[in-house]
Amino acid sequence: MKVTVNRKAHFNAAHRLYNADWTDARNATVFGKCANPHYHGHNYELIVSVKGEIHPETGFVMDMKILKSLIETEVEDKFDHKNLNEEVPEFKTLNPTAENIAVVIWNKLRSKIDENLELSITLYETPRNFVTYSGV
């Protein structure tokens, strides 16, 4: 029997969506206000979901204390109150869209979580705009 456990986290970060190969006009057309050269910020909500079999001895799919610690060290400490474009190495050459942020977070956590467990990342950029990435 597989069960999914979820852990919520939050971080605040600034970013700018743009393509350096495009003109300012094209960036503004494609990314709108998000292309502001002075950046803008979001209060991100993150849901990390881990799915797997319940361990017969512990009753856990995954120890939530371990998951909490991984999220703190791999996501919150690295992204919270940061300018993603300027301060997070992965986004020096990768546009920090919600989609790309979710993939980066998934990659950071995947190697730290038992390979027998499924991992899914849901990232809310706003209460109505969110993405989910499951590594597929």
What do the predicted segments below correspond to?
Residues 1-136:
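Charge-rich, low-complexity N-terminal segments
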